[in-house]
Amino acid sequence: MNLPFNISQNELSDLLLNISVERPVFIWGAPGIGKSALVQKFADDVGLECVSLLGSQLAPEDIIGIPKIDGETSCFMPPKMIAKKEPYVLFLDELNACSQEVQKAFYSLIHERRIGEYHLPEGSVVIGAGNRSQDGAIVKTMSTALINRMFHVQLVANTNQWLDWAYNEGIHPWITDYITQRPDHLFSEPPKTEEPYSTPRSWHMLSDAIKSYSAGDKPISDNILRVLAYGSVSPNHAGQFLAFVKNIGNKNLLNDIIKGEARFPSEPKDRDVLYFVAQSFRSRLLMELPNDKKMLNQNTQQLAHRAKAMIRDLAHINIEIAQMVVSDDDNKSLPEWFMIEIVRDLPRLIAKNR
């Protein structure tokens, strides 16, 4: 499923508080963006126990229970983890990864909040979650009957909200500082090949690994840090993260270059740092320069003016990296008006610098 509108982490918390008490909610989203953690946090916030069932590992009898003979009749005894006396949050994770038979077993539980003769305690909440088919995850077609029994939302990662959470949770400062500079690296679409990719979960995993090594007597070696980074996040992001850590003593380098107080690193040994700073420069331009030139304010006008000279300086150091700053990448391109000015002004800037 691909819904036309998305919600952030904070919006999901508000939505669950207002909707899930009345109707079951299904959360769609890519792997690793925090669906399970947000449901657990919601349960904690409302003071309810959270019981998680993993749809991909369930059989129908795990839900409806087993029959019990009572005189001349029988009834199904629901499993203990579901049949509770106090209200709770029932979280059906990977619901769209279970078989059609299991989906059918969930019908009455989701729609009527009952299994056979057992009814969920008053005040209980039912929430489902699952990955999307375009994410390369193992999913099955969800029946229309099941879809129609739930309210659907699509969750996306929000960098600012994740950083707020990360600071409170003690995520390693290398990670938070890096994502602050490269917010576009918090999440990357799942790749077609079998390799790690960046998600809030994988950055959290990298943070835990770095903190585990840092707790020892010896500082973490460059080789081990390289292994940890490339084993956790997207290869491109891992390489730039390593360059960022290498330059950690001057994490404000890009701002200093923009202000004219520093220059791009030009030594061959600093080529990885140059690439990271150039990528950060491109990301800054994409985020801050408006598509319509009429929307420029004083700050963005100064940035655009300074950016032309910076691209000229980059071209003197490494033409390929300078081209990377202005080229189309992942369907993202710099504003057309800015590119026209680059083509118009760059020869003059180069001649002036000779």
Can you annotate each of these PLM segments?
Residues 1-181:
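AAA+ P-loop NTPase catalytic core and its hallmark functional loops
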Residues 2, 6, 10, 18, ...:
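Detector for Asparagine
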Residues 106-110, 275-277, 281, 321-326:
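Conserved short hydrophobic patches within well-ordered secondary structure
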Residues 298-354:
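Long, positively charged, glycine-interspersed low-complexity recognition regions
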